[in-house]
């Protein structure tokens, strides 16, 4: 740069001057992106089965039934949660219990 003002010739660099072996890349190459149909075909189908889950209310011990559709892993996880961490409540008991653990 010569002088106080910057001119375009001072900024633009020619790659051929720096590295003569650098060649421009053709961005319109022959590659194709997969279509949505191809993407969905590649995903394995997740097998879900219907289950009836019977548990006792956490307060009054009345039988509660819920119906779910889950994977084998999902139903086992739900079983573990219901046994160890979570209790379902019937509609009558939900009004009697404090919400949010308070």
Curated annotation (Swiss-Prot):
Residues 1-43 are annotated as: E7 terminal domain. A motif (LXCXE motif) lies at residues 27-31. This is Protein E7. A zinc finger (unnamed) spans 57-93. The gene is E7. Its main location: host cell. Keywords: Activator, DNA-binding, Early protein, G1/S host cell cycle checkpoint dysregulation by virus, Host cytoplasm, Host nucleus, Host-virus interaction, Inhibition of host innate immune response by virus, Inhibition of host interferon signaling pathway by virus, Interferon antiviral system evasion, Metal-binding, Modulation of host cell cycle by virus, Oncogene, Transcription, Transcription regulation, Viral immunoevasion, Zinc, Zinc-finger. GO terms for molecular function: DNA binding; DNA-binding transcription factor activity; protein domain specific binding; zinc ion binding. Highly phosphorylated. It is found in: Host cytoplasm; Host nucleus. It comes from the Viruses. Plays a role in viral genome replication by driving entry of quiescent cells into the cell cycle. Stimulation of progression from G1 to S phase allows the virus to efficiently use the cellular DNA replicating machinery to achieve viral genome replication. E7 protein has both transforming and trans-activating activities. Induces the disassembly of the E2F1 transcription factor from RB1, with subsequent transcriptional activation of E2F1-regulated S-phase genes. Interferes with host histone deacetylation mediated by HDAC1 and HDAC2, leading to transcription activation. Belongs to the papillomaviridae E7 protein family. Homodimer. Homooligomer. Interacts with host RB1; this interaction induces dissociation of RB1-E2F1 complex thereby disrupting RB1 activity. Interacts with host EP300; this interaction represses EP300 transcriptional activity. Interacts with protein E2; this interaction inhibits E7 oncogenic activity. Interacts with host TMEM173/STING; this interaction impairs the ability of TMEM173/STING to sense cytosolic DNA and promote the production of type I interferon (IFN-alpha and IFN-beta). The E7 terminal domain is an intrinsically disordered domain, whose flexibility and conformational transitions confer target adaptability to the oncoprotein. It allows adaptation to a variety of protein targets and exposes the PEST degradation sequence that regulates its turnover in the cell.
